[in-house]
Amino acid sequence: KCNPAGGTVGGCRGVDRRHWISECKAKQSYVRALTMDSDKIVG
């Protein structure tokens, strides 16, 4: 079930590859937004 090419990367899991990709992208964008906001506040 876990494929090195597109299995569980970064702790992202999904029913299928499409759902898995969408979940990963959503999480990455959310984390990036938080990091950008924190950088702006600090800087």
From Swiss-Prot:
Keyword list (alphabetical) reads: Developmental protein, Differentiation, Growth factor, Oogenesis
* Entry's Gene Ontology molecular function annotations: growth factor activity; nerve growth factor receptor binding
Supply the PANTHER family for this chain: NERVE GROWTH FACTOR NGF -RELATED, NEUROTROPHIN-4
The chain's coiled-coil residues are none
Between which residues do disulfide bridges form? Answer: none
**Gene Ontology CC terms, in alphabetical order:** axon; dendrite; extracellular space; synaptic vesicle
One biological-process term from Gene Ontology? Answer: oogenesis
Name it. Neurotrophin-4
